[in-house]
């Protein structure tokens, strides 16, 4: 009864009885607070990788949910990780208002959107934002994979109110949150995002390639622009697909290596670096080794950046 009454009165977040003392302070901070929380629902790139070798970090593709205080949830990308987020949100039994930011429409960033159940629930409200590709709008990009042929349900079946918005390089503001966008170095139009809230900031930069010096695609001006975009961020979540050795045979594939990311994080003077979008051929042990390679690279640069490789379900708070 209390939940139904709260929803009818327009509440999107509330505390329910009985109060759980072990989580009360965290719940209250979230409800009233000036912090942001990022939850990782998928950290892999290219395609999901089930199996024993991916149990620790998880095998789902890109999806990160960011909560700023009591503002509507922001979801970044709709890879296979968004299915677990869907299950979590459905278990909350409350009306959902959220924004879904798409970096780009490659499959590992959009192909689980049709399985995001809250989109089909009347009373929920979503805005789906991302870069258009030529004359193709974000609405057309998202509906193309739900045309009744490749997937049996079309976007006309969405029960929630769903709005689409095309983005370029721009700044948007809502609920005391500022979101800035930047076009990244990746095939097609791929957007990076910087989220600012109450003096804190988090950058979501995937997919992206910076190239090594001497390679045809190396652009120092672009790298400096990206460092300026990320400068001083409390958290940088970024494409770190390859080790330096792996990158040598995969230059031009649209993804970054450990050394490239280490130099970016050090130049941008971010507080915390989170490795993301792991190559599907990398096992959990390989990611452990890549994390150690990153820590050593940062140390060689004299950087004090804290570095982690999040696992599915991990949360970071700032």
What residues fall within each predicted segment?
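C-terminal output helix
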Residues: 19-28
């Amino acid at each position: 009864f209390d939940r139904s009454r709260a929803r009818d009165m327009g509440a999107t977040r509330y505390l329910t009885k009985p109060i759980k003392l072990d989580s009360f302070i965290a719940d209250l901070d979230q409800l009233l607070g000036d912090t942001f929380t990022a939850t990782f629902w998928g950290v892999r790139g290219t395609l999901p990788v089930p199996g024993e070798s991916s149990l620790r970090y998880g095998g789902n593709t890109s999806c990160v949910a960011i909560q700023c205080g009591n503002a509507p949830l922001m979801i970044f990308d709709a890879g296979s990780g968004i299915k677990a987020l869907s299950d979590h949100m459905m278990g909350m039994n409350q009306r959902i208002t959220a924004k879904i930011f798409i970096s780009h429409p490659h499959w590992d960033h959009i192909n689980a959107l049709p399985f995001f159940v809250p989109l089909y629930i009347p009373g929920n409200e979503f805005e789906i934002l991302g870069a258009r590709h030529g004359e193709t709008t974000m609405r057309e990009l998202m509906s193309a994979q739900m045309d009744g042929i490749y997937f049996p349900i079309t976007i006309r079946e969405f029960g929630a109110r769903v709005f689409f918005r095309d983005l370029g390089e721009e700044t948007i503001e809502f609920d005391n949150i500022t979101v800035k966008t930047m076009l990244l170095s990746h095939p097609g139009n791929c957007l990076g995002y910087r989220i600012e809230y109450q003096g804190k900031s988090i950058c979501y930069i995937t997919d992206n390639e910076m190239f090594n010096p001497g390679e045809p695609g190396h652009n120092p001006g672009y790298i400096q622009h990206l460092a300026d975009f990320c400068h001083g961020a409390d958290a940088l979540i970024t494409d770190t697909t390859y080790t330096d050795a792996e990158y040598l045979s995969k230059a031009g594939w649209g993804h970054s290596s450990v050394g490239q990311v280490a130099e970016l994080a050090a130049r941008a003077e971010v507080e915390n670096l989170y490795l993301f979008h792991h190559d599907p051929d990398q096992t959990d042990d390989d990611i452990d080794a890549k994390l150690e390679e990153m820590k050593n690279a940062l140390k060689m640069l004299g950087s004090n950046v804290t570095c982690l490789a999040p696992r599915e379900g991990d949360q970071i708070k700032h």
